[in-house]
Amino acid sequence: MLTPLFAIAPATVTWSPKVALVMIVCNVIAIAVGKATIKHPSEGAKLPNAAFFGGMGHAALLGTTSLGHIIGIGAIQGLAARGVL
């Protein structure tokens, strides 16, 4: 019953340093965009070393890294489909 669906599912990429680099870059970009666009980034619980994360609070960092992972998944799948990864 599910076999035809498995046939059209894209192949996943094995984890490698290239894949890790793409994910790191996407997260850094998302943190930079979040730092520039979030109105009150330091609200909520504080991080142990807030200066390392640009003074962002826990909620802002969690939100930006979540967005970074979503962007990273799309970038990794797109680059894998093109044969770059």
Swiss-Prot record:
Pfam families: PSI_PSAK. GO terms for biological process: photosynthesis. GO terms for cellular component: photosystem I; plasma membrane-derived thylakoid membrane. It comes from the Bacteria. Keywords: Membrane, Photosynthesis, Photosystem I, Thylakoid, Transmembrane, Transmembrane helix. It is found in: Cellular thylakoid membrane. The keyword Thylakoid applies. Belongs to the PsaG/PsaK family. This is Photosystem I reaction center subunit PsaK. It comes from Parasynechococcus marenigrum (strain WH8102).
